[in-house]
Amino acid sequence: MNLSSLRPAKGSVRNKKRVGRGQGSGNGTTAGKGNKGQQARSGYKRPIIEGGQVPVYRRLPKFGFTSRSRKTITTINLLQIEQWLEQGVVSNELTVQDFKTLLHASNTDYFKVLGAGEVTQPITITAHFFSKSAEEKIAAAGGKTIIAFRTLAEAVNIKGLPIEEALLKEKVKLVKVKKAKPTA
């Protein structure tokens, strides 16, 4: 067996249909489009019209809805953060903006740090959520966790603290997120 003897499986490759190239080809004249009407013309065809058949959008039931208050949470493990530290990509302080840049996640609402992996050096991480194991490992390495909230209302809702207390606690840090200007 050599390269010149290789052939595709029998019946797997067909010649291209050259439509509208004369009646002798079997696909000439109307080129397989039938006679006249919207579907014989070039361009867009109405996809929903199925003739007398009940269309698919009526055969299938309605279900679900799109939540307007849906928030996206991007997770990141300590393993990844440790790799960034070793490579010198980040300093010993990580903020929400750093996560957005490094993970290419500008559309993410929240970041959650998970505990997979180990942290060997003290690091200060600002994120919206931390798993218990991640908090413990960061504290054990001599680091600090700061919970970032986008609004005071979020600080109260998530932590269940009165606003004054929330502002006094070291764990709560307000982060202003600039909305991107729409580009034309």
Swiss-Prot record:
The keyword ATP-binding does not apply. SUPFAM superfamilies: Ribosomal proteins L15p and L18e. Residues 1-45 are annotated as: Disordered. Keywords: Ribonucleoprotein, Ribosomal protein, RNA-binding, rRNA-binding. Residues 21-35 have a biased composition (Gly residues). It holds the Pfam family Ribosomal_L27A. GO terms for biological process: translation. One of its GO terms (cellular component) is cytosolic large ribosomal subunit. GO terms for molecular function: rRNA binding; structural constituent of ribosome. Part of the 50S ribosomal subunit. Binds to the 23S rRNA. Belongs to the universal ribosomal protein uL15 family. This is Large ribosomal subunit protein uL15. It comes from Chlorobium chlorochromatii (strain CaD3).
